[in-house]
């Protein structure tokens, strides 16, 4: 085993030990998002593979009975037909339909999108918000309030997350991390 492999294994063990579930909420708790630690691990792993390029995928999860809380349990890898560069990411669709159909059978659904801003802030860009507004308006997604999670920074070191929800017909709403 070479040194790089040992370092990646050590980083992987460290990440699993230190990553916890993260909760974001809007003022008045109208919208709440809970991201599982395994979902964050999936995103960090994909970001490490992407290096200096943006990457992303879809978010899969379920909703509370009153639909006020999205519980995110999976972040997919980027579809093979995605386009990515240093400052751009356009998610493809290859393989998503059968994946979502399989998850739907287990009570899980498309809840939104995630992507990576390498070395940068997790703040959503105007393009990010326009994309989510378009998804909210598109009935094909069957998601009235899609979530957007952005991981920014260095996934091997210091990174942070942002969360937004885009209610159909309204402006996107930035959520704040709930510190427990």
From Swiss-Prot:
What residues form the catalytic site here? 54 (proton donor/acceptor)
- Please give the positions of the paired cysteines in each disulfide bond: none
The enzyme class is hydrolase
Q: What happens when the gene is disrupted?
A: Essential for CBASS function; when the operon missing this gene is introduced in E.coli it no longer protects against phages T2, T4, T5 or T6.
Q: Name one Pfam family in it.
A: Prok-JAB
Q: Does the keyword Hydrolase apply?
A: yes
Q: Which InterPro entries match?
A: JAB_dom_prok, MPN
Where is the signal peptide, in residue numbers? none
Annotated MPN domain residues: 33-165
Domain of life of the source = Bacteria
Binding site residues for Zn(2+) = 115, 117, 128
Q: Does the keyword Hydrolase apply?
A: yes
Membrane-crossing ranges are none
UniProt induction comment: Part of a CBASS operon consisting of cap4-cdnD-cap2-cap3.
Q: What GO biological process terms are annotated to this protein in UniProt? A: defense response to virus; proteolysis
> What is the annotated role of this protein in its UniProt record?
Metalloprotease priming reversal component of a CBASS antivirus system. CBASS (cyclic oligonucleotide-based antiphage signaling system) provides immunity against bacteriophages. The CD-NTase protein (CdnD) synthesizes cyclic nucleotides in response to infection; these serve as specific second messenger signals. The signals activate a diverse range of effectors, leading to bacterial cell death and thus abortive phage infection. A type II-C(AAG) CBASS system. Reverses the primed state of DncV, the CD-NTase. Cleaves a CdnD-GFP (green fluorescent protein) fusion protein precisely at the C-terminus of CdnD. Overexpression decreases the efficacy of CBASS protection against phage T2. Antagonism of phage defense upon overexpression is CBASS-system specific, Cap3 from this bacteria only antagonizes its cognate CBASS system and not that of C.freundii, E.coli or V.cholerae.
Q: Which family does it belong to?
A: Belongs to the peptidase M67B family. Cap3 isopeptidase subfamily.
Q: What is this protein called?
A: CD-NTase/cGAS isopeptidase
What species was this sequence derived from? Answer: Enterobacter hormaechei subsp. hoffmannii (strain UCI 50)
Supply the gene name. Answer: cap3
């Amino acid at each position: 085993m070479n040194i790089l492999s040992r370092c990646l294994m050590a980083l992987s063990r460290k990440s699993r030990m230190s990553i916890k579930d993260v909760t974001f909420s809007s003022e008045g708790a109208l919208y709440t998002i809970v991201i599982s630690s395994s979902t964050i691990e999936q995103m960090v792993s994909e970001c490490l593979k992407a290096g200096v390029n943006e990457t992303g995928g879809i978010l899969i999860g379920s909703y509370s009975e009153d639909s006020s809380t999205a519980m995110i349990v999976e972040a997919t890898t980027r579809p093979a037909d995605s386009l990515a560069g240093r400052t751009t990411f356009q998610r493809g669709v290859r393989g998503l339909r059968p994946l979502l159909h399989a998850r739907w059978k287990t009570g899980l659904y498309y809840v939104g999108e995630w992507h990576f801003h390498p070395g940068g802030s997790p703040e959503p860009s105007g393009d990010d918000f326009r994309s989510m507004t378009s998804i909210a308006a598109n009935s094909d997604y069957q998601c009235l309030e899609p979530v957007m999670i952005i991981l920014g920074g260095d996934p091997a070191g210091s990174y942070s997350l942002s969360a937004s929800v885009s209610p159909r017909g309204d402006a996107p709403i930035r959520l704040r991390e709930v510190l427990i």
